[in-house]
Regions:
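Short beta-strand-to-loop acidic/aromatic patch adjacent to the donor-nucleotide binding site
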Residues: 89-99
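Cell-envelope/extracellular polymer assembly enzymes that use nucleotide-activated donors
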Residues: 8-10
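Active-site-proximal specificity loops/subdomain of glycosyltransferases
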Residues: 49-87
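C-terminal catalytic/acceptor-binding lobe
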Residues: 13-14, 18-25, 171-234
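Conserved catalytic core of nucleotide-sugar-dependent glycosyltransferases
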Residues: 101-178
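Short, acidic, metal-binding catalytic loop of nucleotide-sugar glycosyltransferases
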Residues: 27-37
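Short beta-strand/loop segment that forms part of the nucleotide-sugar
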Residues: 37-46, 62-64
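Conserved short acidic donor-positioning loop in nucleotide-sugar-dependent glycosyltransferases
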Residues: 17, 29, 43-48, 67
């Protein structure tokens, strides 16, 4: 039934063993939705901990088996396939361990709409010190006032349907050889998205002020790396 509806925002959240943080985020979304018509999709990576989401009007999809870091691309492909037939003006990807700023949906949409470049493809909404690095595309960020052009994506963003169309609704397989020399590397999904979109000439941006808050809690996929480099939002 919900696939026949038209939405202002479709929010996609991936989660693993964080029932309380997810519940906090879903409550946050409910409090921020105002008059917007919002569809929330939760992709659970086969969590061991018990979730009680009965009070929330969401659609929950559970992966089987657990994909973890090395097969995270498989979970993201599942999200891409699922939203292919969903009619929504905007799509927002969120991790399960963030909270939203006040007036989140209106502010995020406003800044996204203010970017007039024809090659705009996405606006990242989790901003930390990484915006000052070249990251995966060897691009020095450019300051445009309320946002930076950064040319990378780290799976916390707002976009329209063309983002997924350009990627053909598919993340290519990420081989386990990626982690042989460095087991602490990330899933590789954000890196692949960034490199592919940059190569095809599309522009990726970050808000100057983070639209979400991310604390110093333990990472589920990059525990050791997060002890060295924390994700503390601006």
């Amino acid at each position: 039934m919900f696939m026949k509806e038209e939405y202002d925002f479709c929010v996609i959240i991936s989660t693993y063993n964080r029932p309380q943080l997810l519940s906090n985020l879903l409550t946050n979304i409910e409090n921020e939705k105002k008059n917007h018509k919002i569809l929330v999709l939760v992709f659970d990576d086969n969590s061991i901990e018990k979730y009680d989401l009965s009070k929330f009007n969401i659609k929950k999809i559970t992966m089987n088996p657990n994909m973890g870091k090395k097969k995270y691309y498989f979970l993201i492909n599942a999200t891409f396939s699922y939203i292919k037939n969903i009619k929504s003006k905007y799509f927002i990807y969120l991790p399960d361990d963030v909270t939203l700023i006040n007036n989140f949906f209106d502010e995020t949409k406003r800044i996204y709409q203010s970017i007039n470049h024809p090659k705009k493809i996405c606006l990242n909404i989790l901003t930390d010190d990484r915006v000052n690095r070249t990251n995966w595309t060897n691009f020095n960020s450019v300051d445009y006032g309320e946002y930076y052009q950064t040319q990378w994506n780290d799976l916390c963003f707002i976009a329209e349907k063309n983002f997924f169309e350009v990627l053909n609704y598919k993340i290519d397989k990420i081989h386990e050889s990626r982690w042989v020399k460095n087991p602490n590397l990330s899933s590789g999904v954000g890196q692949q998205i960034s490199v592919r979109l940059n190569k095809d000439g599309y522009n990726m941006y970050h808000t100057k002020k983070s639209m979400v808050h991310h604390g110093s809690h333990e990472s589920k996929m990059n525990k050791l790396e997060r002890t060295k480099v924390s994700l503390l939002t601006k």
